[in-house]
Design a protein with these regions (language model features):
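N-terminal active-site segment of His-dependent metallophosphoesterases
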Residues: 1-68, 141, 341-342, 349-353
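A general structural motif
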Residues: 47, 79, 142-144, 172, ...
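His/Asp/Glu-rich metal-coordinating catalytic cores
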Residues: 23, 49, 58-195, 199-204, ...
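Acidic/glycine-enriched edge-of-secondary-structure segments
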Residues: 21-30, 119-124, 232-248
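A generic secondary-structure signal
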Residues: 37-45, 72-73, 136, 256-257
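Accessory, non-catalytic peripheral segments of nucleic-acid enzymes
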Residues: 220-353
């Protein structure tokens, strides 16, 4: 028997502010399409249930078109149950919709669904039950037990916090969590593990790397496999461009260092040391690299090589600034470099990060 653990789909999220309009529109569409593909995968691969561990929607009050889409996907996948436990983003309005026999929900008390020799039990956290939910969880040890929660693992109980130490010794085989967008797992106790499936699609440069879901294979015990499933991958790389004289040379160094995939999104950080007279390279390097992939963002994080002697007789404001920084004995060499980097960019009218 197979069960899918997924979470943090964030249908209807505001991607618009992160990218140009045409890119954000395509990514918004792909977030929806990936959920549709997930349902299709489940139906075609004999999956009996999909566990949605919170934040299916990005808002407590989803747009009608987003809710209609979600329920239509479930209605069109009748062979698969969808167990939806609301998270901190969709804690109020996600359940409003049509009644579907394969759509299962949770609430402020523990609720259980049984599939063969495994039981799935979940509860939606609130300020009222955040502490008491641990003492009310009782699971038999002679069957397989999956528990669903949404929150950040923590040492103490609280709203949107999952206190792992209070779940130990509870006969949990697999703790299916939502809230953290990066896939991760760990040992809960001698019997069970906990896991975050992560989000299905990365949406910003804080969500780099593979994204997908966890496939649970259930026999006498539960085994799990992470399945990369996103339409695209968001990649962040540092590229050393020391010594380059301009943005074009930097872009050539990037092409040599990075094996671009045309379908992916990239954040390239230019690092290293370049001559003091080299201007800000990020924006121009983006233009030179625009054809390398689906979307690219380039940040110039290089240091400027400052020769103090070259500014000894410079009568400009820049010269005065450099001499003043080097004369300050209270600053370390690293502090001087950072101040000069930011100050020279500011004097040149460039963006400071």
């Amino acid at each position: 028997m197979k069960i899918i653990h997924a979470a943090d789909i964030h249908i209807g999220s505001n991607i618009d502010s992160r990218y140009p309009k045409e890119i954000s529109e395509k990514l918004n569409t792909e977030v929806r399409n990936t959920f549709r593909r997930l349902a299709k995968y489940a139906a075609e691969n004999g999956v009996c249930a999909v566990l949605l561990a919170g934040d299916v929607f990005d808002s407590d009050i989803p747009f009608k078109k987003d809710k209609d889409f979600f329920y239509n996907v479930i209605e069109n996948t009748p062979s698969v149950d969808f167990l939806y436990l609301r998270g901190n983003h969709d804690s109020c309005g996600g359940y409003e919709g049509r009644e579907l026999p394969n759509f299962k929900t949770f609430g402020p008390q523990w609720r259980e669904y049984v599939y063969g020799n495994v039981a799935v039990r979940g509860i939606e956290m609130s300020a009222e039950n955040a502490s008491s939910l641990y003492s009310t969880l009782e699971l038999p040890k002679d069957r397989l037990n999956i528990v669903m929660l949404h929150g950040q693992t923590a040492d103490a109980a609280g709203k949107d916090r999952v206190c792992l130490k209070r779940l130990r010794g509870k006969n949990i085989d697999y703790l299916a969590l939502g809230h953290v967008h990066k896939p991760q797992e760990g040992k809960l106790d001698e019997r069970g593990i906990y896991a975050y499936s992560g989000c299905l699609e990365g949406r910003g440069f804080d969500e780099t790397g593979e994204r997908g879901f966890i496939l649970l294979d259930i026999g006498e015990e539960i085994t799990h496999t992470f399945v990369p499933f996103s339409e695209r991958t968001i990649v962040e790389r540092d590229v050393d461009v020391s010594g380059v004289s301009d943005a074009h040379a930097a872009s050539l160094a990037v092409r040599e260092a990075v094996a671009f995939d045309k379908e992916n999104l990239y954040r390239i950080n230019l690092v290293g040391e370049v001559p003091a007279d080299v201007g800000q390279m990020g924006e121009d390097a983006e233009k030179y690299l625009a054809d390398a992939c689906f979307y690219i963002s380039v940040k110039d994080r290089t240091r400027r090589k400052i020769d103090a002697a070259a500014f000894e007789k410079d009568v400009s404001l820049r010269g005065e600034f450099v001499r003043a920084v080097y004369a300050d004995e209270e600053l370390s060499e690293e502090e001087k470099k950072q101040i000069l980097r930011c100050g020279l960019r500011a004097l040149a009218g460039e963006e400071i990060e």
